[in-house]
From Swiss-Prot:
Family to which this protein belongs: Belongs to the GcvP family. C-terminal subunit subfamily.
Enzyme Commission number(s) from the entry: 1.4.4.2
Domain of life assignment: Bacteria
Enzyme class: oxidoreductase
HAMAP family: GcvPB (MF_00713)
Residues spanning the signal sequence: none
Species in which this protein is naturally found: Bacillus cereus (strain B4264)
Residues modified as N6-(pyridoxal phosphate)lysine: K273
Keywords from the named record: Oxidoreductase, Pyridoxal phosphate
UniProt GO cellular component terms: cytosol; glycine cleavage complex
Protein name stated in the entry: Probable glycine dehydrogenase (decarboxylating) subunit 2
Function: The glycine cleavage system catalyzes the degradation of glycine. The P protein binds the alpha-amino group of glycine through its pyridoxal phosphate cofactor; CO(2) is released and the remaining methylamine moiety is then transferred to the lipoamide cofactor of the H protein.
Length: 491
């Protein structure tokens, strides 16, 4: 049943079928034209599907069974930290005092929620080594943009209008150069060396009086710790630039190392990744930004403060970059992250990193004989393989990813980072058991052997899914975004 094709909800529709009946009107009827201008009133009825409640329940249940999520199976998507989301988080987020409040309520009536937000900020300050944190940004890339706007405001306040360039490594997340561009900067690429780390000599070459910031993920997207980070920070700071920390890989250093101690001036976090907010379905996320003291004046307003009279939002921020989101951030995700941090404690967070790193290194060593290992050294929370040897036999990394679907696994991240040919990036996270890891590894080994003995099986995969291979070029260039009702059959 899971792999059967599913009709569109419009195709299930039958004229006259009713899903829900409204009770008889017991108040005076109000005509739409008495309330709305004619421009806002439909001339024709909306073409909505006519289905029963049972039809719609079966339809969406069937669709949900075709989805893959952390609760249904292993999800080794590199640089995405698809860890299990503890269900206690959901219970706490549904407390009436959190779920039934509104951001326009008087501050005096939501002191408990504000206390949670303030305490969460304090925990994140301790975890990152920053001086303060704002919870306003909605997700990772939004946090990146916010952090870069803070850096821009800082430089402009100091009269440094010529600092128009942001440096990113060739292994950087794609959102880094995108966020820099949206924030009004020009992106400059710094190369990696033969060890997969930022090339210090190339960094010295590109850093100058026009440098606004260097954006880094540490460990980087290859899963390798930038061991020269203190020297890199000195190079950037001596040139008058700022050091930005992309928190996508914070799961690798929790309670082990802090960005603030490495010399970073700004950090964004992904609460929906590192701190177990559910993600993968389009949102919501949460991307708090932490800063050092000299950037505090520019934080988006309002900022949450604690006084002897309780908690309040301070809007008196003349140098602030303004708001970056309505209200105060994605509160529900913040509740979940707070619950996770309090449940784990410092020792638990330290164990998170230890098991995440252990799992990644175990998988890397077991798979290394069957796939190319571009950087043969200890990794952190994730690692990168290459399908170069499989490509020589006519099988691409894309084919390997499609074959994994036949075994019920979500594929790893592929073709990223861009500086590794036929890249396969795997992040197991700390929440997976050895048995789960071994099951995935065994299938990866099986696929490697199939490439050598029967490559057509891999080249033509997937074989068991409802949808085989999409025409991705056509889907991108000519997407079908609306249902077109079939024309009446001419008799």
């Amino acid at each position: 049943m899971k792999n059967q094709d599913q009709a569109l909800i419009f195709e299930v529709s039958k004229e006259g079928r009713i899903g829900y009946s409204l009770p008889k009107l017991d108040v005076e009827e109000v005509k739409l034209e008495d309330v709305f201008e004619s421009d806002y009133i439909r001339v024709e009825d909306a073409e909505l599907p006519e289905v029963s409640e049972l039809d719609i329940m079966r339809h969406y249940t069937a669709l949900s069974n075709r989805n893959h999520g952390v609760d249904s199976g292993f999800y080794p998507l590199g640089s995405c930290t698809m860890k299990y989301n503890p269900k206690i988080n959901e219970s706490v987020a549904r407390f009436a005092g959190f779920a039934n409040i509104h951001p326009l309520q008087d501050e005096k009536t939501v002191q408990g929620a504000m206390e949670l937000m303030y305490d969460l900020q304090e925990h994140l300050i301790e975890i990152t080594g920053m001086d303060t944190v704002t919870l306003q940004p909605a997700a990772g890339a939004h946090g990146e943009w916010t952090g870069l706007m803070l850096i821009r405001a800082y430089h402009e306040a100091n009269g440094d209008f010529n600092r128009t360039k942001v440096i990113v490594p060739d292994s950087a997340h794609g959102t880094n150069p995108a966020s820099a561009t949206v924030a009004g900067f020009e992106t400059i690429t710094v190369k990696s060396n033969e060890n997969g780390l930022v090339d210090l000599e190339d960094l010295k070459r590109v850093v100058n009086e026009e440098t606004a910031a260097l954006m880094l993920t540490n460990p980087n997207t290859l899963g390798l710790f930038e061991e020269n980070i203190l020297e890199m920070a000195e190079i950037v700071h001596n040139a008058g630039g700022k050091l930005y920390y992309d928190g996508a890989n914070l799961n690798a250093v929790l309670s082990q190392a802090r960005p603030g101690d490495m010399g970073f001036d700004v950090v964004h976090l992904n609460l929906h990744k590192t701190f177990t907010g559910p993600h993968g379905g389009g949102g919501p996320g949460s991307g708090p930004v932490g800063v050092k003291a000299d950037l505090i004046p520019y934080l988006p307003k309002p900022i949450l403060e604690k006084t002897e009279n309780g908690y309040h939002f301070n809007y008196d921020r003349p140098e602030a970059i303004g708001r970056v989101k309505p209200f105060y951030g994605n509160f529900g995700i913040n509740v979940r992250a707070y619950t996770y941090i309090r449940s784990m404690g410092p020792d638990g967070l330290r164990a998170v990193t230890e098991y995440a790193v252990l799992n990644a290194n175990y998988m890397m060593r077991r798979l290394a004989p069957f796939y190319d290992l571009p950087f043969d050294r200890h990794c952190k929370h994730e690692f990168v393989l290459s399908g170069r040897r499989q490509k020589k036999l006519g099988v691409r990394t894309l084919d390997i990813a499609k074959r994994l679907l036949d075994f019920g696994y979500h594929p790893p991240t592929i073709y990223f980072p861009l500086n590794v040919e036929e890249c396969i990036m795997i992040e197991p996270t700390e929440t997976e058991s050895k048995e789960t890891l071994d099951g995935f590894i065994d299938k990866m080994i099986q696929i490697a052997k199939e490439v050598e003995e029967n490559p057509e099986v891999v080249q033509e995969a997937p074989h068991t899914t409802v949808i085989k291979r999409l025409d991705e070029t056509m889907a991108a260039r000519k997407p079908v975004l609306r249902y077109a009702k079939p024309a009446p059959v001419q008799v």
